[in-house]
């Protein structure tokens, strides 16, 4: 699965299927406000799962795989779930969901990871803003179902922006998996009592060397100096920028300044955190770094985000 609505040939699975004895199955799930509008605060019991219907779509798909994949030559007792980018984070989330126990047996998170879902106090606040922006009261909540999807997305977008302006809530995590402690445990994934029912499976975490390559759209940055990279990073790292660049240059002496810049922007801190958390379950955990650079634009693209697909 991927975490967005994009379509690429790489997601079709044909090439993966050619490489070994596997049955490849891609899935769909609801995204954004359609899949993750938490209305449980205003809708009560009837809307208790509303903040996670996108993840529940994935669980439903995995149940279908469990019940039907043998008809296609697959093994329901040997299911690997794999996702890339936002889909990698979704894989981490699925691996923390009690409902996935027995449905998945291995997991692979590519160029995306997480160790926790969004705080429900925050997501419920966004739900209140959605209702207000739609001009509805709590007793009229069911009318949201009749709003055309395009109109609803616009309503949710406006509500999200107003909530950010009023509450300072990050728009990036507004519409994503919710730690409702019902479908998705609260706290750090794979740890604590609330995660005792989560799947305990081996997992691979992988990122690319140059996830966020600053010179993809600007060839002139190929000639940037190490001092130039330091200056570019000062707004983000302040006085530590110089020591960070020097540390990367020492560890990777064969890399050019622009490559070092890309690698710093592509920090693996969250991946390491997720892998260490998963390791506590006692199953094998592997961390990989994808470095193959496709011969595109005079090799300027390097190992960019999505190239691992």
Where are these regions (language model features)?
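Cap/lid segment of the alpha/beta-hydrolase catalytic domain
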Residues: 1-59, 63-71
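Loop/turn elements at helix/coil->beta-strand transitions in domains of secreted/extracellular proteins
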Residues: 19-25, 75-79, 100-106, 199-202, ...
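Alpha/beta-hydrolase-fold catalytic nucleophile elbow
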Residues: 28, 82, 97, 106-111, ...
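Active-site rim elements
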Residues: 47-52, 113-118, 189-190, 250-265, ...
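Substrate-access "cap/lid" subdomains that shape
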Residues: 67, 101, 110-228, 259-276, ...
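Short glycine-enriched nucleophile-adjacent loop
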Residues: 88-100
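Mobile gating loops/cap/lid regions near enzyme active sites that modulate substrate access
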Residues: 269-309
């Amino acid at each position: 699965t991927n975490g967005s609505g994009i379509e690429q040939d790489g997601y079709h699975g044909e090439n993966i299927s050619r490489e070994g004895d596997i049955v490849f199955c891609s899935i769909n799930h609801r995204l954004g406000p359609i899949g993750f509008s938490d209305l449980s605060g205003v809708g009560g019991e009837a809307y208790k799962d509303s903040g996670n219907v996108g993840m529940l779509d994935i669980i439903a798909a995995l149940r279908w795989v469990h019940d039907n994949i043998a008809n296609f030559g697959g093994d329901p007792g040997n299911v690997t779930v794999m996702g890339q980018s936002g889909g990698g984070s979704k894989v981490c989330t699925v691996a923390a969901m009690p409902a996935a126990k027995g449905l998945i047996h291995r997991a692979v998170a590519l160029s995306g990871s997480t160790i926790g879902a969004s705080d429900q106090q925050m997501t419920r606040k966004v739900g209140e803003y959605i209702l207000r922006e739609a001009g509805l009261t709590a007793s009229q909540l069911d009318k949201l179902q009749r709003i055309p999807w395009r109109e609803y997305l616009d309503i949710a977008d406006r509500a999200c922006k107003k909530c950010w302006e009023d509450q300072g809530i990050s728009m990036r995590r507004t519409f994503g998996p919710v730690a409702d402690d019902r479908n998705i445990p609260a706290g750090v994934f794979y740890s604590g009592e609330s995660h005792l029912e989560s799947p305990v499976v081996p997992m691979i975490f992988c990122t690319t060397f140059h996830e966020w390559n600053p010179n993809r759209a600007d060839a002139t940055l190929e000639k940037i100096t190490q001092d130039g990279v330091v200056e570019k990073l000062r707004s983000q790292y302040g006085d530590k920028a110089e020591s960070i660049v020097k540390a990367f240059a020492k560890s990777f002496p064969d890399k050019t300044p622009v490559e070092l810049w890309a690698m710093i922007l592509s920090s693996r801190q969250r991946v390491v955190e997720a892998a260490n958390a998963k390791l506590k379950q006692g199953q094998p955990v592997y961390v990989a770094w994808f470095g193959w650079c496709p011969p595109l634009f005079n090799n300027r693209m390097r190992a960019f985000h999505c190239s691992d697909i």
